[in-house]
């Protein structure tokens, strides 16, 4: 936090206002991948309900073996779409067969992890970057594809839009602690500081 505060005065103010931030970690990489697919395009409440059903169906622990023991109908009965069932079963088979070595991912650089994960069905760049932060505990990840990160940047730095060039400038400024900066940007986007989003300003009407 001290380093980020020295690098960026506005972020320093945010850090002082919010104080320490903590986020839930996903220590099991397979569980993180499957739960990420389960939650895609769902509200938090719906995703939690379906995930709980999947866990119960798998005997309380979602592993490649317990997941593959369930047929498609059983997983559909938990609330998963046919496409999501196909995704999670494919990933389970990849891990169970050894084609995907999850332990090896911890030894790879960030870009290589993203490349490996995005080759899996249902895993995009954003999901891979969240895995980097919350499962592999990588210290320097700021996701351009995260809408809340964009919102937090707009709110902190008073921009109407965040293009790639502007995003990269901030990302470089936060390095090598981009993941910590991400936590604060998410907190800001969630209303922790009471800032408004410049992108949501109502344009002033012109006089006739």
Model-assigned labels for residue ranges:
Residues 1-21, 110-111, 125-208:
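C-terminal accessory module of base-excision DNA glycosylases/AP lyases that mediates lesion recognition
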Residues 25, 45-49, 62, 66, ...:
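Alpha-helix N-cap and coil->helix boundary residues
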Residues 33-37, 75, 171:
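Amphipathic alpha-helical segments that form the core helices of the histone-fold
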Residues 36, 52, 115, 151, ...:
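Active-site phosphate/pyrophosphate- and oxyanion-stabilizing loops and adjacent acidic/basic residues
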């Amino acid at each position: 936090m001290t380093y980020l505060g020295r690098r960026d005065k506005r972020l320093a103010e945010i850090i002082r206002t919010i104080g320490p931030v903590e986020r839930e970690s996903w220590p099991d990489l397979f569980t993180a991948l499957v739960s990420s697919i389960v939650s895609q395009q769902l509200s938090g409440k719906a995703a939690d309900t379906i995930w709980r059903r999947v866990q119960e169906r798998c005997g309380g622990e979602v592993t490649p073996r317990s997941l593959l023991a369930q047929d498609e109908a059983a997983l559909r009965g938990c609330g998963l779409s046919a496409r999501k069932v196909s995704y999670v079963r494919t990933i389970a088979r990849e891990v169970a067969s050894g084609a995907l070595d999850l332990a090896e991912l911890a030894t790879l650089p960030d870009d290589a992890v993203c490349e490996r994960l995005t080759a899996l069905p249902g895993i995009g760049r954003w999901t891979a970057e969240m895995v980097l932060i919350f499962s592999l505990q990588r210290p320097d990840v700021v996701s351009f594809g995260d809408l809340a990160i964009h919102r937090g940047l707009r709110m902190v730095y008073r921009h109407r839009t965040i293009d790639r060039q502007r995003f990269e400038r901030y990302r470089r400024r936060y390095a090598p602690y981009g993941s910590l900066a991400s936590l604060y940007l998410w907190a800001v986007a969630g209303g922790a500081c009471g800032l408004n989003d410049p992108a949501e300003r109502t344009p002033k009407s012109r006089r006739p």
